[in-house]
Amino acid sequence: MQNNHYHIIVPIKDSLETAERTLRALQGERVIIWNDNSTSENTQRLHELAAELQYECIDVAKLTDHPSPNYLLLLHMMRERAIQENAHLIIVESDVVVGDATISRLLREAEEDNVGMVAAVTEDDMGTINFPYEYARRYERGRIATRKRLSFCCTLMTLQLLKRVDFNQLDPDKQWFDVTISKLSRESGLTNLLLTDCPVRHYPHSSRPWKQLKYTHPLRYYWQKLFYDRDKI
């Protein structure tokens, strides 16, 4: 029987144009907005959207003075909440637009035995698989069991994974944890699935424009990465 208990969390730091598109595409779902130190003006707008769409909005600035990104806090808080409520946890990034059937498909695949993570492949507006799943361009369309990392662009972590994997193993000096959790899921005996026939639209790094330098000016990107201690995965 399908587990109908789940939470969708959308981490947002400013970039309201793409974030609003993400939130509206999820209308009717159980969504938690993770407002990770957006400006006061954008925070107000996020609360307006939350009220309109009947979402919950968590202001991270009220929980910690740690600078964005606060993914580790998100993962610890939401894991505890999901376990208490016997729920799966779905992360949808604020630069992703889901389709009408995306969430139901993730949930359906999550009911297979020994599944840890289920991710929707990402595409651009032309229908070409894009970052971070370029490696999947050679795959057939369908349900792919993979040992490669799954991004948090649009990914479900099953209740089974949340119970089995202790997030206290995560390195607090890092900022992003999709690589680590993908590995821990496999090491715990679970299978990670990539759905190459269930694409979502992805507009990479809309909330962190400096990361576009990785493709346009790689030297500047790596200088900022090292000098400002950014983008640690």
List where the protein language model places each region.
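Conserved glycosyltransferase catalytic-site signature
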Residues: 71-76, 96, 103, 150-152, ...
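Short beta-strand-to-loop acidic/aromatic patch adjacent to the donor-nucleotide binding site
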Residues: 86-97
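Short, well-formed alpha-helical segments that are part of the catalytic scaffolds
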Residues: 14-28
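C-terminal catalytic/acceptor-binding lobe
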Residues: 171-233
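Active-site-proximal specificity loops/subdomain of glycosyltransferases
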Residues: 53-83
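A conserved acidic beta->alpha catalytic loop
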Residues: 34-46
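Hydrophobic targeting segments
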Residues: 4-10, 26, 30-34
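Conserved catalytic core of nucleotide-sugar-dependent glycosyltransferases
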Residues: 99, 105-168
